Amino acid sequence: MKRYIKNTLLASVAALTLCCNTACIDETTPKDMAVPGQIASNSKSLQYLANSLPSFLVTWNTYGSTYYTQDWGYPCQMYMRDLLCADFPMSDNGYNYWIYTEDGSSLRYAYYYSYFYYYNFIKNANNVISIGNQAVNGGNEVAKQYLGQGYGYRAMLYLDLVRLFEYKKTGVKALDDEATTLGSYGVTVPIVKETTPTQDLYNNPCAPFYTMYRFIMTDLNRAEECLAGYTRSIKAYMDRSVIYGLKTRLWLEMASRFEQSAAYLQKQIEAENADDGYDKLGINSAADCYAKAAHYAQKALASDGYHPLTEAEWSDPTTGFNTANDSWMLGTLVNSKEQINELSWYTFLGWMSAETEWGMGTTKYNAYRCIGKALYDKIGDNDWRRASWINPNDAGASTVPSGYKTNVSGEKWSTLPAYCNLKFRPGSGNTTDLTVGLIASLPLMRIEEIQFDYFEAIAHTQGVAAAAAALQEWVNTNRYTDGSYTCNATTMDDFIDALMIQRRVELWGEGLVFFDYKRLNLPVTRKYSGTNYASSMQLNSYDGYVAPWMNYMIPETEKDHNPAVIVGPNPSGAITAE
C-alpha cells in the first residue's frame, strides 16, 4: 500500500497520547510560545510578544510529533475545513494523507490536533493580553496596540472553535439521540482567559453558546477600543477593519442561529444580564443581528485602501494568492527561509500549488487538489475565475491552451489533470526551488468575504430583491467580462443558493465556506452524475442538517483531565459512500 496508510496510522498513534486539552494548556509550551514571566513590560518587549501571534499562524508541529501531517499551523486548519466540504477532491488519493478524514471513516484524531493547536494559540493570546494589560495600567499607551492584537486574535480563535466544535443536528438519528443524552446541544468549548486560575482548568465546563457569544463580543469590543487610531505595518496584524470583519462574522453566525430557533434567541436574551463581566449584545431578534452584521460589514468595506481582486491580481503567476494586496484584510506573513518547512507535504502550498516541481502536485505523487465538477459547471463561461481550474477539454494538452495565466511548460501542463487548481501560486512564482516557492503568505480574510456577508445580511433587512440586485451588480462589475451574470432569486432559499455558488467559487481553498455550510444547515453533496470524487469519498449529507463530519469532537483526553467538559458523539462512519 502507498504511504498514506503509514503516515495516517502513525499520526493517529501520536494523537492517542495527546495532552491536547485546556487542563494541559498550563503545562505545554510549544515553540514560538510567549511566556509572560520571561518578557518585561516595555514597548519593545511587547512588540516581540505580540509578534508571537502572527508567528503562531504559520508554526508547524506544535505537538512535537515525529509525524505531523495534520499539524502545520493555521493553513492546515483551513485545508482541513475545505476537504470536509463538497468542492475539494484530489486527483489521485494514493498519497492523500487525509484520506480517512475525507472519507469520514476516522475523524477523531484530526479533530484532536485542531483542538490542541487552537488552545495553544489561545495561550499565546492570553499572554499578550496579560502583559498588555499590565503595561496599559502602568501608563504605557503604546501597549494598547499590542493589547488589541491579543483581544482580536483570541476572539478570532474562539469564534472558530465555536463554529467547529459545537454539535448541530445531522439527521443521523443515532448521533443526534446520543447528543441529546450527552447534553451536547447548545454548548461550545471551555473558555480559558488570561485570568483563569490553574485549578479551574481541571473543572472547566463547555460554555453555553449564549455565554460564548458575549465573551467573544467583549474581546472584539476591547480590541476595537485598543486599536483606535492604530495603523498597521503588515496585514498579519489586526486593525479596526479586521475587527469589523470579525464582528460581521459573529453577528451573521448569531443571526442564522436565532432565525432558526426562537428558543435559542430567548436563552440569549435571558443571559443578557448574567453576572459574568461580559458585554451585553443589546438584541431582541434575529433581524437585529442581521442589521448588526450589515452595519459592521459596511464599516469594514468603507475602510481605506480595500478593493476586490482584479483579474490580473488574482491570476498573477508570481504573486497570485501568495502576496498581500488591497483585497486582503488579514493574512499570514511568511517572508524568510527560516519560517518554512522544507518537507513540502507538511505545507499548504506543497499540497495546493499544482505548478511546482517540488510539491505533491507532481507526477511522482499525482496529489493535485481539484475543484468539484458540480461547482465548476456552475461557473459562467464569461467569469474569469473559471481559468483558475483546468477545463477537462484542456487537460493533457501538449501546449498551454490560451486563457490560462501560468509559467509552466507544455510538458508540465500535459501532466495536470482535469479540474486541477491554478489558484494558489508558489512564492515568487518559483516552481523549481521550494526554499523560494514556500516563502509565501495566505489570506485569512478578504474584502470579498465581507461583501458576501453584507449581501446575505441585507437580504434579511432590505429584502431578497435588493440583495439579488446588489449581488448581480457586484459579480458583473468585478468577476464577469461581459456583464452577463444574472441573479433571478425571488425567495430567500434561491438567493442563498446563488450567493453560496459565488462564495464557493470565490473562496475556494481558503477554508471559509465550511462555516457557511454549518451555519446554514446546507448539505454536502459529493455523489452525483459525473462526480470527480473517488468512490469512497462520495458522501452525501442530509438536506436541512449539518454534515456529521462538520461537528468536531473534543478529545476524550480532555475529559480525563477536565471532567466537566462534554465530549460529543464521534461522527466517524455516520454516513458512508453508497
Residue spans for each PLM region:
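Conserved, well-structured interaction surfaces
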Residues: 90-168, 202-212, 220-233, 435-442, ...
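Membrane-proximal, proline-rich intrinsically disordered regions
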Residues: 23-79, 322, 350-353, 359-366, ...
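Hydrophobic-face positions in mid-chain alpha helices that act as interaction patches
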Residues: 268-447, 482-483, 496, 506, ...
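Inward-facing hydrophobic residues that define packing positions of alpha-helical scaffold repeats
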Residues: 122-125, 213, 220, 290, ...
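Extended amphipathic alpha-helical segments enriched in small hydrophobics
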Residues: 155, 247-248, 444-474
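Short coil/linker segments at helix-helix boundaries
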Residues: 164-214, 218, 257-295
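Sec-dependent bacterial lipoprotein signal peptides
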Residues: 1-22
